[in-house]
């Protein structure tokens, strides 16, 4: 999982990327290709 300050650019890397908010943190998740996972930090 990548940890980035800004997730805006990462969201556009794959069309199935979804932005979700869990426990106050923002994550990018991708079920078909998990290597795109990221967290804002």
Swiss-Prot record:
Record's GO cellular component terms: ribonucleoprotein complex; ribosome
Keywords recorded for this protein, A-Z: Ribonucleoprotein, Ribosomal protein
Keyword Nucleotide-binding annotated: no
SS bond partners: none
GO biological process: translation
Source organism, top-level taxon: Bacteria
InterPro entries, per database record: Ribosomal_bL36, Ribosomal_bL36_sp, Ribosomal_L36_bact
MF (Gene Ontology): structural constituent of ribosome
Pfam assignment, any one: Ribosomal_L36
NCBIfam families: PRK00831.1, rpmJ_bact
Family to which this protein belongs: Belongs to the bacterial ribosomal protein bL36 family.
Protein name according to UniProt: Large ribosomal subunit protein bL36
Annotated organism of origin: Chelativorans sp. (strain BNC1)
């Amino acid at each position: 999982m990548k940890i980035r300050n800004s997730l805006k650019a990462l969201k556009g890397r794959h069309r199935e990327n979804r932005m979700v908010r869990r426990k106050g943190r923002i994550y990018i998740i991708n079920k078909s290709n998990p290597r795109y996972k990221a967290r804002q930090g």
